[in-house]
């Protein structure tokens, strides 16, 4: 890649800045960490690795980066692409081989959504491998749009107000998951991926499925953004500005014991009868 144009340079700086802010805000990476960067071969994880490698050079702390890809034995998966790319940039890497593809195809009827089971199987395998190599953090490539889509999916279809946190302690208590791209937009990541000409590997399982609930929500959010530019940013800001007393979850706020404060200063209004 040659010299960047002004706009390309701004894009790169913006992504690096936003990733750095997210890492700082949530204390994602600490001195001495060994960060296992989960690389799928998609635009998001390539961008995450690229930015983390840059931040590793300029950060005031020292941390290791190990790239890990999970070969799920999907038919036609180009096994050579990631090793060749990672060797070319000099990054330590591991390829974890686990035939989750056959399990998913066996358990999920044809035409049904495979994403949930596929994700659980992949996550469990990666958690175990993180333990094996002594990784202290596991970095995933989810971005701002993913987080918002998950929020609306859970609200519309699950009846819960939850999304993807930028930093998460896994259920096993042994893995800390971080999402350095939490503040970055998918639009910027797509543009950066094209700029850097990453060797993208398509997903033959979920990537080709149509009419998924997530795709419906994605299109809804894109339409909102088209009609009201900036709405996505405002909605994401709302996830960082929660007011439990203005919702209805009794576990988050003690509504039952709300009482008049006898010591509160009375407020009197002058009323004019017309």
From Swiss-Prot:
Its main location: cytoplasm. This is tRNA-cytidine(32) 2-sulfurtransferase. Its EC number is 2.8.1.-. One of its GO terms (cellular component) is cytosol. It comes from the Bacteria. One of its GO terms (molecular function) is sulfurtransferase activity. GO terms for biological process: tRNA thio-modification. Homodimer. The keyword Nucleotide-binding applies. Gene3D superfamilies: HUPs (3.40.50.620). Disulfide bonds: none annotated. Pathway: tRNA modification. It catalyses: cytidine(32) in tRNA + S-sulfanyl-L-cysteinyl-[cysteine desulfurase] + AH2 + ATP = 2-thiocytidine(32) in tRNA + L-cysteinyl-[cysteine desulfurase] + A + AMP + diphosphate + H(+). [4Fe-4S] cluster binds at residues 115, 118, 206. It is found in: Cytoplasm. Keywords: 4Fe-4S, ATP-binding, Cytoplasm, Iron, Iron-sulfur, Magnesium, Metal-binding, Nucleotide-binding, RNA-binding, Transferase, tRNA processing, tRNA-binding. Binds 1 [4Fe-4S] cluster per subunit. The cluster is chelated by three Cys residues, the fourth Fe has a free coordination site that may bind a sulfur atom transferred from the persulfide of IscS. It comes from Pseudomonas aeruginosa (strain ATCC 15692 / DSM 22644 / CIP 104116 / JCM 14847 / LMG 12228 / 1C / PRS 101 / PAO1). It is an enzyme of class 2 (transferase).
């Amino acid at each position: 890649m040659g010299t960047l144009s002004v706009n390309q340079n701004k894009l790169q700086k913006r992504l690096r800045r936003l990733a750095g802010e997210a890492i700082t805000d949530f204390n994602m990476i600490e001195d001495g960490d060994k960060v296992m960067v989960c690389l799928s071969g998609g635009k998001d994880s390539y961008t995450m690795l690229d930015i983390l490698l840059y931040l590793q050079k300029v950060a005031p702390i020292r941390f290791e980066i190990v790239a890990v890809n999970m070969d799920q034995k999907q038919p036609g998966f180009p096994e050579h692409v990631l090793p060749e790319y990672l060797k070319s940039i000099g990054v330590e890497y591991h390829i974890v081989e686990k035939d989750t593809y056959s399990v998913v195809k066996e358990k999920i009827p044809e035409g049904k959504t495979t994403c949930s089971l596929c994700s659980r199987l992949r996550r469990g395998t990666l958690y175990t491998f993180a333990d094996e190599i002594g990784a202290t953090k596991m970095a995933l490539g989810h971005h701002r749009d993913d987080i918002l889509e998950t929020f609306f999916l859970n609200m519309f279809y699950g009846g819960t107000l939850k999304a993807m946190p930028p930093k998460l302690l896994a259920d096993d208590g042994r893995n800390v998951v971080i999402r350095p791209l939490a503040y970055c937009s998918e639009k910027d990541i797509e543009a950066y991926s094209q700029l850097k000409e990453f060797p993208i590997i398509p997903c033959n399982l979920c990537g080709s499925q149509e009419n998924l609930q997530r795709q419906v929500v994605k299109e809804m959010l894109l339409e909102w953004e088209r009609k009201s530019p900036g709405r996505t940013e405002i909605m994401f800001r709302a996830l960082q500005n929660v007011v439990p007393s203005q919702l209805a979850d009794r576990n988050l706020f003690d509504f039952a014991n709300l009482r008049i404060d006898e010591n509160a200063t009375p407020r009197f209004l002058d009323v004019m009868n017309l």
